[in-house]
Swiss-Prot record:
One GO term (biological process): proton motive force-driven plasma membrane ATP synthesis
Function: Produces ATP from ADP in the presence of a proton gradient across the membrane. The gamma chain is believed to be important in regulating ATPase activity and the flow of protons through the CF(0) complex.
Membrane protein topology class: Peripheral membrane protein
Cross-referenced PROSITE patterns: ATPASE_GAMMA
Residues in the signal sequence: none
Protein name: ATP synthase gamma chain
Lineage, top ranks: Bacteria, Pseudomonadati, Pseudomonadota, Gammaproteobacteria, Alteromonadales
CC per GO annotation: plasma membrane; proton-transporting ATP synthase complex
Length: 287
């Protein structure tokens, strides 16, 4: 029964792996719920800032901030949000394919591209492919704060201010539901027009110290909050993808255990049959 012992060892090994994947599935589910709460909490902040920016812009039509002005696109920047860890299916690779396809279109029209990367997966991917990486950060954990991202965002904003890039995008996985995560590219700069800016109503507010200074600060905060929102959404997507991947691994382990158990039972039955045959043959020989 040497074969039977090997199969029993394999079954025990797969059962141990199944326990690990099952535990990881439960942990990912818990973290996903927490990430969803953070995602929902951060949305109103960015929305309200965007509304205030629209109000100031409408009330101060003689001043156009550089972040609101379209210019010829010679250089494009992408802030790519990825995960620090794996075991989350094709979440990262699908995102990288999306941004590389978009970057290829920009390059085909004569534009240069550069990247700011968030997460160790994007850091290693874009550095290994020899892309121009202007800013990088990783190790944010499951509960990052907006201040963690300020430095990397500032590098890309400075490049925009200096005319080193003419358009800036944030690339992340958008959380739709547990089973669906969409690789998304949102334009940050120049600031896309909102519905508020399409209307002709002007708001009569008094700003201190002045509207222009306030607009400068708010636009930077808005860009930071949009990147932060992308990071939070990506975390929710990561945990959802990991939960699904670990559930699939747990289910596959169960199927493998059933198959191995069947093989073990057949091997055991064959061994018993062989032993009985030998006993009968021995008895016949003695008789």
């Amino acid at each position: 029964m040497a074969v039977g012992k090997e199969i029993k060892t394999k079954i025990a090994s797969v059962k141990n792996t199944q326990k690990i994947t099952s535990a990881m599935e439960m942990v990912a589910a818990s973290k996903m719920r927490k990430a969803q709460e953070g995602m929902a909490a951060s949305r109103p902040y960015a929305t309200n800032i965007r509304n205030v920016i629209g109000h100031i812009a409408l009330g101060n039509l003689e001043y156009r901030h550089p972040y609101m002005e379209e210019r010829e696109t010679k250089r494009v920047g992408y802030i790519v949000v990825s995960t620090d860890r794996g075991l989350c299916g094709g979440l990262n690779i699908n995102l990288f394919k999306k941004v590389l396809a978009d970057a290829a279109e920009k390059q085909a029209s004569g534009a240069e591209v550069e990247f700011g990367v968030v997460g160790s997966k994007a850091t290693s991917f874009f550095n290994n492919m020899g892309a121009k990486v202007s800013a990088q950060i990783s190790g944010l954990g499951d509960s990052p704060s907006l201040t963690d991202l300020v430095g990397s965002v500032a590098v890309m904003l400075k490049a925009y201010d200096n005319g080193e890039i003419d358009k800036l995008y944030v690339v992340y996985n958008k959380f739709v539901n547990t089973m669906t995560q969409d690789a998304t590219i949102d334009q940050l700069l120049p600031l896309p027009k909102s519905d508020d800016e399409e209307i002709s109503h002007r708001w009569d507010y008094i700003y201190e110290p002045d509207a222009n200074s306030l607009l400068d600060k708010l636009l930077v905060r808005y860009i930071e909050s949009q990147v932060y929102q992308g990071v939070v959404e990506n975390i929710a997507c990561e945990q959802a993808a990991r939960m699904v991947a670990m559930k699939a691994a747990t289910d596959n382990a169960g199927d493998l255990i059933d198959d191995l158990q069947l093989v073990y039972n057949k091997a055991r039955q064959a061994a018993i049959t062989q032993e009985l045959g030998e006993i009968v043959a021995g008895a016949a020989a003695v008789g």
